[in-house]
């Protein structure tokens, strides 16, 4: 399988409800925090993995132990992702924020449609992660492959591979990677926050909580043109 060396920054969006601080901070009295943390350490799969990595003499400051980097490999998506079913841990990242938004909006919209959600505003945060590794090149495969064909290709990726690189259907001109090994991730930082406006039928508008305060029409995100160009 052809491989591509990658050393760049990649993007994804997560709901803003996932806190960047300790979950119990400010919610319970100090004398109860220790007991709550002990319970969580025994039941939380992400923290169990973190404990195993630390016991193997991993630096506690290592990027792979950062919550945003470790959680995707412990809380699997039961629906799978583009080239991997729900049994193989993987993290999808986009090569720029427009592509990350296009992918995120499409998937949030599909979920909200299935659940028949009433009109609502969804707050999301954009994360940026450095990546350095060698990725199997799937860009030669057509966008319209069936799910069965795509997962069969993913199943051919050997254990120990860093991941795969491909064109996402949400924005075919762009690049997406599926990371299979957390070791290739650098330290993630949060950047811009967005609000997705769900009107009960579709996501009709995005607001950026940045200095420019831009409004973004979701339908322009999937095109080759830069949706953020002035």
Swiss-Prot record:
- Identify the keywords attached in UniProt to this record, alphabetized: Plasmid
Q: At the top level of its lineage, which domain of life is listed?
A: Bacteria
Q: What is this protein called?
A: Uncharacterized protein y4oC
Task: Give the organism, scientific name.
Answer: Sinorhizobium fredii (strain NBRC 101917 / NGR234)
Lineage of the species this protein comes from = Bacteria, Pseudomonadati, Pseudomonadota, Alphaproteobacteria, Hyphomicrobiales
